[in-house]
Amino acid sequence: MHRLKQRYFLPIILALLCAGLGFWGCAASRTPDSESPAKIETAPPIGSIIPVRGAITHLHESDKKFYTVIDIVIGDHFQGTLPDDIDSITVTGPQGKLALGKRDFNYHERFRDFWISIPGAPESGTYTFTVTSGKRSGSATDTQSTPITIPLPDIRTFSPAAGETITKIPPHFSWQAVEADVPLYYRLDIKDMQDNYIFRTGYVKDMFSAHAPSSILKPGQSYRWRVRVVDGANWIELDNRAQNQWQQITVAQKLSEREYTYRVPPEINNDWQTSSLTEAGVDSEKIDELMHRILIGHDTVKNVHGVLLVKNGRLVLEEYFYGTHRNHLHPIQSDTKSIVSILMGIAVEKGFINSIEQPVLGFFPEIAPANLNADKRAITIEHLLLMAPGLQCRDSYRYKWRGLSEMRQSADWTQFMLDLPMAETPGTQFEYCNGASFLLSAIIQKATGMKTLDFAEKHLFSHLGITELRWPANPQGITIGWGEMRLKPRDMAKIGYMMLKGGNWQGKQIVSRNWVNESTQPHIKAGWYKYGYQWWRGNAILDNRVIEAIWAWGHGGQFIFVLPALDLVAVFTAKHYENPGFSERTFNMMNQYILPAFKLSLPPQQKISVDKKVLETYVGTYNFEHDGQTEIVNIILKDNRLHGYSNDEELVELHATAENRFFGRSKDIGGFKLQFVKDGNGEVFNFLLHFAPQFGLLRVPFDKVE
């Protein structure tokens, strides 16, 4: 065990985390980043095809003139060196081939983007973009609607204004709305004085302000910023855009931290009823502390994009950071899997699928799978739901998502999955497998005759009032079941609250209560967690009580937590892709801030007094050995009350519920329970520590050494 920190019980957590989660890593597949057009949402088949996407845009530039902008982006799966290995680029418009070649295009390495800006507005119609590399070629099309003029953002409304000095962090940028007859999406761009982008948000509908990360701006340096306004949610969909001239600002040598101010979430179009934290009986001090740490970009909580809390059916907290917004369609990554589970329940309930015990191969009679044997014939829908089909997926962080990458590059994803060799007997071993979730979507499409997206919109999203989302399909037209969905955070909370209420939303039963109960049961062991039907299940400890938790878990820090005992739904969005242990941050936020803030929802825990002579028998030094390392905990008496500490760090009071049973709360592991154990001679020889540092309930023995 490697000691990364010296805090109360934390080294234990780190060791057990590596041992318990190392086999599957970080929950879900990495999906494209909306901020970079270089990331292709759907994988091309392998072979001679170059993966390419293209877009044509009508630009209203800051010089008040109009331009035609062409972007041609080469996908990640291109095998070659860019830009050199692209031999030719041709563009054909409504009136025929344009007089353009590769040498006319600029190349942006970060985005793998060949681009050009041509004076004049584009013609309406369809454009085809073709690239070649040796004998390989690829093409894409984009249709330009009738160009409209989006007004330029008014720099007179900008804050900070041109020439202004920033004195507070995180820096806050704001502007007024642009008036137009179409929905508009805004993006904040920031560059350094060397013309390098250092920050930009995604395109967000009706976003008029944004905080940028504190770390991007250096004291005493100058920067430039602007706002883009477009008529689409992402670069491939928009037709028209406008952007103001760059505004130069300076950062003061000495900066002060911006204070967090709580505001009750607004009620919007009968979306959510809201109330204040105080009205909900929540300790707002803990929430304020967490929000402030996120706001200033503290290392332990940096890159958190959004936090939403629903208590007793009311939205009581809604905060967004780093340029995100309530209208932002955020990547929810593998939270998508949990939604696919709901859709499977609806499909069964409505009779499209007879039973989850049906064999998977029966849905694909046109496929003759390789490596066919009795085990493969025995794979059922339930095995896919449990991540236990027994297939050799090689599809987790441990394998660097090798299986997922190979599937995305295959000519037929369903065939690829069904061809995989067997590694285990179906239903016996949890092994994280994105392809299993993809097959669930493929089965829904086969059984219903509808794309999974269309089925979801008809039978789930429409009933929840979810009208805006993105959920792409693969090259064969099958909705991607493992991830890549984008939802607004408020809509993520609807999914969670519907599950909390047993499949019911505002009095309407969307999916049966039986399915909700069954899909969230602990069917199979998954590391130190349990796994249901594409839902995770674990525990937290709050004031000596073990609290059941159910959650959807998406790569990068996307979570939908459901805690029935507290009538609480917690939603987190983030961009925690830089570290395979990213999930630790979110669980720590839950344990250290969110759960303690809601402890008033539970009846007070009864505490008892224990005789001082008994307490004295517990005093001493205890250790726990793991992987050649020793964790030491000292138990002491202070003011006639029992306390524990490790490595001279946090002193934690132990509250008695019985003569030998205690509980407490550490800032590092959250709530815990502790039981002293005596030998046959009545001597205390160890204590048992029960804790749930990342919602995995653990039991660790500490032996008394002196």
Report residues per predicted region.
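Beta-strand-rich modules
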Residues: 217-235
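Active-site SXXK
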Residues: 288, 313, 331-356, 384, ...
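A short, well-structured edge-of-sheet supersecondary motif
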Residues: 292-324, 567-571
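Active-site-adjacent helix/loop patches that line small-molecule binding or acyl-intermediate pockets
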Residues: 362-365, 371-466, 489-503
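Active-site Gly/Thr loop motif
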Residues: 467-468, 516-571, 648-658, 666
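Peripheral terminal and inter-domain segments
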Residues: 601-706
